[in-house]
Amino acid sequence: KPNSAISDTLYYIQEDCRFEGEICFLIKDKKIEGIGFGLDLTKAGIQNKMKKKGLPWERAKGFDKSAVFSEFVKFDGNIKTLEMKLFINDILTQHATHDLMIYKPAKILSEISSFMSFEDGDIIMSGTPKGVATYKKKDIFMGEIYIDGKLIISKSFEVK
């Protein structure tokens, strides 16, 4: 996503805008340095039109204010006990462990490195578990990241 996509506030965009909770990785010195929680927003109607035409999805994914993130904490790379939860209005909406990751962080890093360079501060959004849906104003999102069953990140976003 472009830098203009990153926001401190989660905004209601339009009716067919969907959220995706994701485990995110912060890059430093071309390696994964930190881990955080992110919400990736998608304009579903535009995405579907682009898919049908065989076109890239940038218009649906890279629009202004289409991503919000928690803080990032140091990450040692051990994904075996990694877990993500997303609650909306106190209801568990998405839940994923490392077992559900189609591509593990090392593979994602390797693949991306094969065609582009990383700079310090780049963020990799690792993909989305089931539970993608639309949202509305005043919804309260709570993203959580766990390692070894211990809560290491908890970030709340209220939709404006």
Segments from the language model and where they lie:
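Catalytic-core "active-site belt" of small-molecule-metabolizing enzymes
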Residues: 1-123, 131-160
